[in-house]
């Protein structure tokens, strides 16, 4: 509501952090910890709303790293390109002279480069191929219902691409998406003189979905064949495409419409025929594939990631004969980073749920050479490569001799270090300054509260005003998201805090943020707790945090507000209507109102359909809760929202009219799901003033 080449590009987002020293153990053991920004003693400048959204001087910088070759590391920072010397770690400005861009048409989208500088891309619904001499060919021509080379399934299941080059650069696999049966939802463009209709293909829960196929284009003869997929009839998802090392086979993770059954199948690239099923997954709640398989260097063994086998997203070593052996054995979610044929690198939350660190595990024999499956269980002890507290993002060189460790922590805004894989070499490339050192910022506290069922510790952060006085009573704003694939509290700069939270604390509010069951990085049971009952366990967990706040002598329990967007908007209205005695004011943005109006892929995973989960849809529908709204509620939404349709909030408003329930409503006529630029300044001013006037 949410791939590896030599030119792997990593976006590094710098966060905000305090410099007050905190011991790592305090973060890890779940104790309540707090820090005061250095500006808390000296800073006097006051944040302005425009600054929190538009100003670059107080915002995290963004840098990008990619390896042009094994010995050529490029850093792009503030629009300037730098070449990084591997021996010294020094960055020297360079000319940004990318000749490859000259063969990319300006209207091209979904651009994918091969290793020999050919490209495949889309223009509109059509798929094209161009070689390095700019000889362009039309691969497949689409129309208003059919597109080629685009991402499918609304970017669920880890899908972000629609074009897949073979390792030998001779073949292009691509998605064909047919939306002929998908219902059109009307969006109105008011910027034209008489208004324009723009229909959106939106596969709504329980209705007809898009149909996907996978084609393969052979460059040598310009021929196209399609993979012959017979699994789960035609109502299924083709996810996470992978090529075999020799480019002869293609692997597809095929998921049925109910999302409870998955098959990893192998097909021949020459004619699309089925070869074999390598493995299967079944779960009575859902299976969610998020990664393609990753072949080991110079091997037919591959890495497969799933949470379905042991309860956490762990890595498994597999081969094309169907053998599967668990590779990582931690009770924490891990993410695959890469392999050099003898070591597999991954990041893991095993140190702490709010930390991400780099590890490796050996996949070679003790005396050298590759391990067989029989030997594998006897070898490989995880080795940790990052030790500084924080959230680490990793970019490896193509030969896996070096990696960039870019990270921030509660104490550190940002740091990027060039390291050798043997931990024998380390050079700091760049380190961020604190852009808020002149501003009046308050105390930030990070800690845990138990989940409502008592099984887990849920992390929170609490921001207090700069001039906090424990003898006073303060209003509280709960900022909430709470949905899948989110984690708002991390050991990043000031715990992942947002500038708007600082702005509100500056105005005299305590701002509270908490992760709950259903969010990511805590294992499958934690994540699946929301299945068929979205909003229910999330509210229960959030209320534990609210009760903790109410027990504090400086919290005014009669002045508690809540704000969230998207899933957070759904949570905001859910909390306002289920617990009107607690929440006085709410601001909901782009809220889901009834899951029957949400899209198939995400919605059916977590809520199934009305036919299979009628009670769940009834209990979670906010249309049934209108008469329970007692406090002040403002709903904001983009009128051309293509994620949560405008239909949601408009139906809620209409039901309020029918039941004579008052609320406040503000649409953003040309905004989609999120509101950007100066429009966002207007939005956040409106949100702020709504709390000022009513809380």
What are these regions (language model features)?
Residues 177-185, 190-324:
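Beta-propeller domains
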Residues 86-89, 131-134, 218-222, 269-272, ...:
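Short loop/turn segments that connect beta-strands within beta-propeller blades
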Residues 59-65, 108, 151-168, 238-242, ...:
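Signature of short aromatic-glycine-proline-rich micro-motifs recurring in repeat-based ectodomains
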Residues 61-66, 70-81, 91-95, 99-105, ...:
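Non-catalytic accessory segments flanking enzyme active sites
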Residues 42, 49, 138-163, 174-226, ...:
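Predominantly five- to eight-bladed beta-propeller fold
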Residues 184, 247, 393-695:
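Serine-hydrolase catalytic core recognition
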Residues 37, 69, 74-79, 85, ...:
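Beta-strand C-termini and the immediately following turn/loop, strongest in propeller blades
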Residues 44-54, 97-102, 136-155, 205, ...:
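Surface-exposed loop and turn segments in beta-propeller and other repeat-based domains
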């Amino acid at each position: 509501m949410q791939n590896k080449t030599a030119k792997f590009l990593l976006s590094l987002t710098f966060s905000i952090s305090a410099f007050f020293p905190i011991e790592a153990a305090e973060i890890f053991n779940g104790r309540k910890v707090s820090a005061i920004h250095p500006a808390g003693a000296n800073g006097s400048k006051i944040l302005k709303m425009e600054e929190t959204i538009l100003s670059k001087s107080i915002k995290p910088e963004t840098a990008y790293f990619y390896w042009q070759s094994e010995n050529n590391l490029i850093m792009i920072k503030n629009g300037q390109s730098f070449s990084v010397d591997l021996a010294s770690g020094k960055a020297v400005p360079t000319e940004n002279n990318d000749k490859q861009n000259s063969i990319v048409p300006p209207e091209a989208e979904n651009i994918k480069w091969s290793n020999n500088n050919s490209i495949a891309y889309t223009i509109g619904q059509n798929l094209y191929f161009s070689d390095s001499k700019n000889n362009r060919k039309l691969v497949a021509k689409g129309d208003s219902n059919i597109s080629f080379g685009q991402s499918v399934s609304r970017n669920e299941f880890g899908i972000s691409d629609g074009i897949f080059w073979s390792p030998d650069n001779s073949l292009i696999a691509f998605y064909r998406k047919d939306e002929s049966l998908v219902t059109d939802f009307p969006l109105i463009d008011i910027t034209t003189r008489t208004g324009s209709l723009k229909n959106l293909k939106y596969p709504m829960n329980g209705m007809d979905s898009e149909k996907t196929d996978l084609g393969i284009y052979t460059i040598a003869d310009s021929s196209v064949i399609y993979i012959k997929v017979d699994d789960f009839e035609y109502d299924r998802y083709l996810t996470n495409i992978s090529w075999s090392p020799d480019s002869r086979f293609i692997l597809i993770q095929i998921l049925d419409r109910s999302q409870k059954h998955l098959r990893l199948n192998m097909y021949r690239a020459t004619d699309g025929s089925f070869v074999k099923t390598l493995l299967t997954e079944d779960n009575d709640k859902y299976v969610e594939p998020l990664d393609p398989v990753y072949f080991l260097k110079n091997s037919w063994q591959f890495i497969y990631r799933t949470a379905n086998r042991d309860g956490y997203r762990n890595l498994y070593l597999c081969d094309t004969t169907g053998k599967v052996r668990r590779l990582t054995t931690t009770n924490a979610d891990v993410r695959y980073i890469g392999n050099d044929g003898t070591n597999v690198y991954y990041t893991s939350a095993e140190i702490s749920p709010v930390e991400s660190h780099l590890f490796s595990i050996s996949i070679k024999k003790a005396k050298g050479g590759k391990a067989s499956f029989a030997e594998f269980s006897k070898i490989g002890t995880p080795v940790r490569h990052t030790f500084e507290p924080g959230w680490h993002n990793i970019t490896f060189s193509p030969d896996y001799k070096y990696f960039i460790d870019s990270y921030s922590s509660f104490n550190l805004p940002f740091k990027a270090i060039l390291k050798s894989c043997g931990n024998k070499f380390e050079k700091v490339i760049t380190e961020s300054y604190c852009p808020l050192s002149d501003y009046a910022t308050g105390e930030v506290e990070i800690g845990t509260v138990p989940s409502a069922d008592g099984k887990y510790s849920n992390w929170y952060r609490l921001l207090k005003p700069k001039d906090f006085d424990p003898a006073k009573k303060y209003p509280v704003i709960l900022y909430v998201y709470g949905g899948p694939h989110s984690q708002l509290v991390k050991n990043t700069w000031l715990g992942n805090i947002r500038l708007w939270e600082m702005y509100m604390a500056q105005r005299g509010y305590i701002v509270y943020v908490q992760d709950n069951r259903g969010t990511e990085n805590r294992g499958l049971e934690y994540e699946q707790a929301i299945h068929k009952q979205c909003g229910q366990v999330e509210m229960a967990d959030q209320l534990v945090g609210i009760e903790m706040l109410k027990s504090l002598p400086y919290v005014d329990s009669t002045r508690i507000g809540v704000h969230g967007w998207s899933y957070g908007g759904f949570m905001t209205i859910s909390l306002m209507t289920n617990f009107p005695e607690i929440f006085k004011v709410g601001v909901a943005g782009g809220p889901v109102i009834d899951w029957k109006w949400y899209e198939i892929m995400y919605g059916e995973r977590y809520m199934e359909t009305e036919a299979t989960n009628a009670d769940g849809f009834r209990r979670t529908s906010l249309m049934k809760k209108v008469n329970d709204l007692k406090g002040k509620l403002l709903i904001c939404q983009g009128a051309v929202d293509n994620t949560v349709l405008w239909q949601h909030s408009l139906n809620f408003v209409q039901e309020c009219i029918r039941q004579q329930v008052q609320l406040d409503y503000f649409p953003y006529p040309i905004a989609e799901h999120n509101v950007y630029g100066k429009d966002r300044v207007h939005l956040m001013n409106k949100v702020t003033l709504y709390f000022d006037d009513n809380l």
